[in-house]
């Protein structure tokens, strides 16, 4: 089992060197018009609502936009499965380019909590929402340079003295309903926070076996940690 160690929010400065070549190389676009972004964003929201249910009117906009180094915007989906779904809508560009493709293609990130949506800062919802925003942001930057697959595990480093966050991934396509943007098929990569001993179990036995245990115990696809581990140390 491959473990991915994410170094969050690292600025990488590169020098671009042009070489002559007889073969034409496709260069992804880096700039899009407001109209392109607006149309693409609406198609993306329409597509993700078909999987997660109608989104909440409120959006958690970052003070510093993700595309210039800030946090991701958080979108909330309280009308699907019990609780609230979280999703990113900024990883895939209007030209379809986004995270490095994995077995489900290019994708956005999703996660779930059993807590109902709440704006109270001392609520359990607010705490897990802020935690998941940090996880999504770290992963969002990392996926630009590395491939992440369903059933893999991951550790996200935290501040000095704090334990790493352990995660496992899965494709999220309930009842075979896939995420599309217009007529283009993409993917939703489910992020689930797990206990360290659960990650060790996945490393030794395979991620699918851990996912099966989480489903058997009724914890899938949620990231709430007010539960007991499904495996012993």
Regions flagged by a language model, labelled:
Residues 3-7, 12, 16-88, 96-104, ...:
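Acidic, proline/glycine-rich low-complexity IDRs
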């Amino acid at each position: 089992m491959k473990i991915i160690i994410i170094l969050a929010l690292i600025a990488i400065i590169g020098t671009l060197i042009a070489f002559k070549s007889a073969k034409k190389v496709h260069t992804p676009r880096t700039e899009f018009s407001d109209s392109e972004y607006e149309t693409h964003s609406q198609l993306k929201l329409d597509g993700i609502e078909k999987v997660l249910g109608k989104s909440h009117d409120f959006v958690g906009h970052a003070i510093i936009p993700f595309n210039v180094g800030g946090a991701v915007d958080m979108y909330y989906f309280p009308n699907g499965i019990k609780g609230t779904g979280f999703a990113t809508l900024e990883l895939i560009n209007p030209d379809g380019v986004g995270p490095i493709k994995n077995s489900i293609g290019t994708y956005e990130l999703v996660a779930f909590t059993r807590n109902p949506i709440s704006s109270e800062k001392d609520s359990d919802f607010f705490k897990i929402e802020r935690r998941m925003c940090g996880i999504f942001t770290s992963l969002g930057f990392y996926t630009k340079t590395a491939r992440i697959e369903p059933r893999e595990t991951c550790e996200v480093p935290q501040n000095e003295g704090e334990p790493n966050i352990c995660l496992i991934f899965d494709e999220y396509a309930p009842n075979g309903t896939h995420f599309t943007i217009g007529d283009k098929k993409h993917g939703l990569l489910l992020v689930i926070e797990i206990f360290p001993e659960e990650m060790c179990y996945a490393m030794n036995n395979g991620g699918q076996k851990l996912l099966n245990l989480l489903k058997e115990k009724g914890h899938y696809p949620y990231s709430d940690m007010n539960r007991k581990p499904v495996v012993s140390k």
